[in-house]
Amino acid sequence: DRDSCVDKSRCAKYGYYQECTDCCKKYGHNGGTCMFFKCKCA
C-alpha cells in the first residue's frame, strides 16, 4: 500500500532520503520523502 515503506526504511535526521526513495520505487511508487522521520511514498 501507499505506506508500505514506513517500517522498512529509515529516515535519517538530516535528509538522507535515498533508502526511503529506493524502497518506494521498488513498490511501484514514484519515490518517497521523509516526514517526521517516517518514510512516505509519493
Swiss-Prot record:
Subcellular location(s) per record: Secreted
SUPFAM superfamilies named in the record: Scorpion toxin-like (SSF57095)
Disulfide pattern: 5-23, 11-34, 20-39, 24-41
Tissue and organ distribution: Expressed by the venom gland.
Molecular functions (GO terms): potassium channel inhibitor activity; toxin activity
PROSITE patterns given in the database record: ERGTX
The family this protein is said to belong to: Belongs to the ergtoxin family. Gamma-KTx 1 subfamily.
Protein name, per record: Potassium channel toxin gamma-KTx 1.2
Lineage: Eukaryota, Metazoa, Ecdysozoa, Arthropoda, Chelicerata
